[in-house]
Amino acid sequence: MSDHVFVYFRVPEALATEALPHWHRWMETVAEATGIGGTLMRRPETRAGVQTWMECYADVPPAFDATLAGLWRQSGLEQWVDGERQVEHFIDLDML
């Protein structure tokens, strides 16, 4: 079964340009630690001065969440996030 992880969070629009290079480094850190390269996306619209960003990781192993959480605790990136990061799992229907 192919497990995909989507992590979404809010970034204040006023900080988005400054936050972006930090997130590129974060994605590199995750790839180096897990061997899984992710994709960084955002909603096209901004609501109430906040953008919604999302990290997407495909074909992750069961231990991925724990590794990602540990890396996040060490990252220092909380300053760029408005609220909590939400982690969601999806599976390919073709694999059922």
For each feature predicted by the language model, list its residue ranges:
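Acidic/histidine-enriched active-site and ligand-binding environments that engage anionic O-linkages
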Residues: 77-91
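Short S/T/G/P-rich N-terminal loop/turn motif that feeds into the first structured element of a domain
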Residues: 1-69, 88-96
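A common structural junction motif
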Residues: 27-31, 72-81
